[in-house]
A protein has these predicted regions:
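Short acidic helix/loop segment immediately C-terminal to the autophosphorylated histidine
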Residues: 1-10, 32-33
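Short beta-to-alpha transition helix within the HATPase_c
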Residues: 11-19, 23, 27, 36-53
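Conserved short strand/loop->alpha-helix "switch" segment adjacent to the catalytic nucleotide/phosphoryl-transfer site
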Residues: 37, 55-84, 91-101
Length: 174
């Protein structure tokens, strides 16, 4: 039983990453080369992918709101990786035992930096006892190296909030 659950989790994580890649490719193929793309379009596609991965016993809603941040074609895959990982982590860990819940993804555009926040109303987590998975490490390094920003977490009994910053496309080369 435990092995089967682990195998299912690994397959779901792989499927989530594959769906993210497909979404990025689909959105990029509809635009012109080098043109910025809509962050909200990407987030809608990623939220749809996440909803497909929910089982019937999971009662989790996902909403999106905020500014439509323009993303460069170079930023888009990195944003997709980070958002997919954060939403997948919330789905897998924030709502144990069939607990109902909500995940919100919101965007705030800034002149130099823009921000994306993934927040859940789940159980929260203790970063000292969290699993040894490398998803958060990948998220942090992706935000720092590809988006030139930072990733921060706030967690407690009312849920978890992850916020990452990224340079706006006009400042990417700095």
């Amino acid at each position: 039983q435990c092995e089967q659950a682990e195998s299912r989790a690994v397959l779901e994580a792989a499927l989530s990453k594959l769906l993210s890649i497909v979404s990025v490719h689909d959105i990029l193929s509809r635009g012109r080369a080098g043109e910025s793309v809509s962050c909200l379009s990407l987030l809608h596609a990623l939220a749809d992918n996440a909803r497909q991965l929910l089982s019937e016993s999971q009662h989790i809603s996902i909403t999106l709101c905020g500014d439509d941040i323009p993303l460069s074609p170079e930023q888009m895959p990195a944003v997709a990786i980070v958002i997919s990982e954060l939403v997948t982590n919330a789905i897998r860990h924030a709502f144990p035992g069939g607990r109902r819940g909500h995940i919100s993804v919101s965007c705030m555009a800034g002149l130099r930096y823009s921000f994306i926040m993934v927040e859940d109303d789940g159980a929260g987590y203790d970063p000292h006892t969290a699993s040894d998975g490398n998803g958060i490490v990948i998220c942090s390094s992706t935000v720092e190296e590809k988006l030139h920003g930072t990733l921060q977490f706030r967690t407690g009994p009312a849920g978890t909030c992850a916020v990452f910053s990224m340079l706006t496309p006009a400042h990417e080369t700095e």
